Amino acid sequence: MRIATEVFGEWADCGKDIGMEKGHALAVEDMISFAIQERANLERNFNFLDLGCGNGWVVRKLENEPLCVRSVGIDGAKQMIEKASKVDSKSEYLHENIDTYSSPEKFDLIHSMEVLYYLENPALTVKKITDLWLNQGGRLIAGCLLYTSPS
């Protein structure tokens, strides 16, 4: 079986990342809208981390939110990070393996879409995220879509 980061790197090279963005847009919009409203209700600025950021489209979306003071994306596919960095010099993009990444800072909002099932040990990684990367009172919001037919 091929490693997911290799496949997604090839997708970045051939433009398939745009299809991923479009396919996930509605679900991500719901998740992010909920989290942003929650932050607004707290009347606090927040920093944001996108795990498995792909071409950075969610990072760019959050960097334009008035309460978001910092927006960071990490992805295991080097080509995705290169693509994200080319179109966005304001945010930080890191080529990292989520399973082994050690964040030097904590975040108020951590987002992940269609990533958890690629991890070596999802439960352990989620524990690491909540214990070490998420600020007290922060929010981890993750999504996995269920497709009922191949596309």
Please describe what each predicted stretch is.
Residues 49-51, 55-100:
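Class I SAM-dependent methyltransferase SAM/SAH-binding core
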Residues 114-115:
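Short catalytic micro-motifs in class I SAM-dependent methyltransferases
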Residues 147-151:
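Conserved small/polar residues in nucleotide/adenosyl-binding loops
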Residues 111:
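A conserved beta-strand element that flanks and buttresses the S-adenosyl-L-methionine
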Residues 45-47:
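Nucleotide donor/acceptor-binding cores
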Residues 1-41, 58-61:
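Conserved class I S-adenosyl-L-methionine
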Residues 123-136:
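A short glycine-rich, Lys/Arg-flanked "PGG" loop and its adjoining helix->strand segment in the class I
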Residues 137-145:
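Conserved beta-strand signature within the Rossmann-like core of class I S-adenosyl-L-methionine
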